[in-house]
Amino acid sequence: MSTIRPVFYVSDGTGITAETIGHSLLTQFSGFNFVTDRMSFIDDAEKARDAAMRVRAAGERYQVRPVVVNSCVDPQLSMILAESGALMLDVFAPFIEPLERELNAPRHSRVGRAHGMVDFETYHRRINAMNFALSHDDGIALNYDEADVILVAVSRAGKTPTCIYLALHYGIRAANYPLTDEDLENERLPPRLRNYRSKLFGLTIDPERLQQIRQERRANSRYSAAETCRREVAIAERMFQMERIPSLSTTNTSIEEISSKVLSTLGLQREMF
């Protein structure tokens, strides 16, 4: 039996919703080589027929039934896509009818509402948070009074991508502070962070994984040496424990999970954009 399986994320909008849900589903299955493709803005019958042809062709190529994760809100488009012979996983269908019964109201099919511009206030909060994250990345700026959270970690432990995710998806003003050699030698919380204890969250990482990441950045250097990575991680973890700073290992944790843990631990209540 072939382990290759073509998977299509099909949407009449950006496709972000279909891909996010589809990816979460696929991670529950191991031993398969999922060949994925996103088809966005399939918003009329002609585009749907073209998409169905692509899906059908992939099935013939790999000699297996394709999977379509579909977030098109128009039932007619979904019917055309189903003509491809693929396994259809409709993102909305299982929930619409129960919601209509519960709310005693019919749905109004609207394309792209999940990821459209909600309002200018939300938009500006998102942009301002992103600008804040970039200007406070890796200790560039140290004025943390306006920060919602300050991520603390050794270099290359996942601070920057987590800050950007928090800014883009939650409008969180996230700064990050890299632990320097001087900080690690003292093994105490850096003085510039002491007034912001309630905003601190530590990130740690497996030393071997850290070495792999640093080798890509600066190979065969003291910075990427195994001993350096082991020492820095060990000191950082002791510091977090001694200073009672909540922390999380990023080694086998997705950015989404890290961000969710940061928000819940620090009690930051924000809706996802």
Curated annotation (Swiss-Prot):
InterPro entries named among the record's database cross-references: Kinase-pyrophosphorylase, PSRP
Keywords, alphabetical: Kinase, Nucleotide-binding, Serine/threonine-protein kinase, Transferase
Molecular function per GO: ADP binding; ATP binding; phosphotransferase activity, phosphate group as acceptor; protein serine/threonine kinase activity
Transmembrane segments: none
Disulfide bonds: none
One Pfam entry name: Kinase-PPPase
Annotated residues for binding of ADP: A153, V154, S155, R156, A157, G158, K159, T160
Catalysed reaction, written as an equation: [pyruvate, water dikinase] + ADP = [pyruvate, water dikinase]-phosphate + AMP + H(+); [pyruvate, water dikinase]-phosphate + phosphate + H(+) = [pyruvate, water dikinase] + diphosphate
Transferase as UniProt keyword: yes
Enzyme Commission identifier(s): 2.7.11.33, 2.7.4.28
Record HAMAP family: PSRP
Main function: Bifunctional serine/threonine kinase and phosphorylase involved in the regulation of the phosphoenolpyruvate synthase (PEPS) by catalyzing its phosphorylation/dephosphorylation.
Entry's family note: Belongs to the pyruvate, phosphate/water dikinase regulatory protein family. PSRP subfamily.
Name of the molecule in the record: Putative phosphoenolpyruvate synthase regulatory protein
Organism: Xanthomonas oryzae pv. oryzae (strain KACC10331 / KXO85)
Source species taxonomy: Bacteria, Pseudomonadati, Pseudomonadota, Gammaproteobacteria, Lysobacterales
